[in-house]
UniProtKB/Swiss-Prot annotation:
Pathway: Protein biosynthesis; polypeptide chain elongation. PANTHER family: EF-HAND AND COILED-COIL DOMAIN-CONTAINING FAMILY MEMBER, ELONGATION FACTOR 1-BETA. This is Elongation factor 1-beta. It comes from Saccharomyces cerevisiae (strain ATCC 204508 / S288c). GO terms for biological process: maintenance of translational fidelity; negative regulation of actin filament bundle assembly; regulation of translational termination; translational elongation. The gene is EFB1. Catalytic subunit of the guanine nucleotide exchange factor (GEF) (eEF1B subcomplex) of the eukaryotic elongation factor 1 complex (eEF1). Stimulates the exchange of GDP for GTP on elongation factor 1A (eEF1A), probably by displacing GDP from the nucleotide binding pocket in eEF1A. The 30-fold higher concentration of GTP compared to GDP in cells favors the formation of eEF1A-GTP, which rapidly forms a ternary complex with aminoacyl-tRNA that in turn displaces eEF1B from the complex. GO terms for cellular component: cytosol; eukaryotic translation elongation factor 1 complex; ribosome. InterPro entries: Arc1-like_N, eEF-1beta-like_sf, EF-1_beta_acid_region_euk, EF1B_bsu/dsu, EF1B_bsu/dsu_GNE, Glutathione-S-Trfase_C_sf, Transl_elong_EF1B/ribsomal_bS6, Transl_elong_EF1B_B/D_CS. Belongs to the EF-1-beta/EF-1-delta family. It comes from the Eukaryota. The keyword Phosphoprotein applies. The modification Phosphoserine is found at residues 31, 86. There is a cross-link at residue 13 (Glycyl lysine isopeptide (Lys-Gly) (interchain with G-Cter in ubiquitin)).
Length: 206
């Protein structure tokens, strides 16, 4: 026999075919060719060879051995199913663990970043009274009494606009995402005893 590489299935097939009509590898008696093939097969499949030789030694007792238990076979089959199920569960658990770790890492990275400062603007408002008899001090007090989250009142002044009438010009700083200027103007104009109208005179991002 040319090849003794029994790791290849083709070699096993060739050996089986060559022994179809003879009892030895070469000739009509045991020779070193048989020994070489035997050792090569045993080297390639040591556990199978050990099992085969062990079972072959008990050939005379084959009929006395008990049949395989159906319950045991079924239990073994169930164990196999459970085993595969366990593998799936372990894989799912591992995937969930990895997902949780990634989310935690993302949140930690996000938390580590410094918070962006709130966008703010400085706004100058013109508040016009009804006439020259309007009490401007009361009007400015009412304006500054308005409180909103993100609103900070600043300096003010009274500017003449004609016929003895003065308007209130007042500065404030607002957080853009918290303070609506429309709402702020509406709140000021609710002081109907003093305020005729309001306008945004200037606005600049900080």
């Amino acid at each position: 026999m040319a090849s003794t590489d029994f790791s290849k299935i083709e070699t096993l097939k060739q050996l089986n075919a060559s022994l179809a009509d003879k009892s030895y590898i070469e000739g009509t008696a045991v020779s070193q060719a048989d020994v070489t093939v035997f050792k090569a097969f045993q080297s390639a499949y040591p556990e199978f060879s050990r099992w085969f030789n062990h079972i072959a030694s008990k050939a005379d007792e084959f009929d006395s051995f008990p049949a395989a238990s159906a319950a045991a076979a079924e239990e073994e089959e169930d164990d196999d199913v459970d085993l595969f199920g366990s593998d799936d569960e372990e894989a799912d658990a591992e995937a969930e663990k990895l997902k949780a770790e990634r989310i935690a890492a993302y949140n930690a990275k996000k938390a580590a970043k410094p918070a962006k400062p709130a966008a703010k603007s400085i706004v100058t408002l013109d508040v016009k009274p009804w006439d020259d008899e309007t009490n401007l001090e009361e009007m400015v007090a009412n304006v500054k009494a308005i409180e909103m989250e993100g609103l900070t009142w600043g300096a003010h002044q009274f500017i003449p606009i004609g016929f003895g009438i003065k308007k209130l010009q007042i500065n404030c700083v607002v957080e853009d995402d918290k303070v609506s200027l429309d709402d702020l103007q509406q709140s000021i104009e609710e002081d109907e005893d003093h305020v005729q109208s309001t306008d945004i005179a200037a606005m600049q991002k900080l």
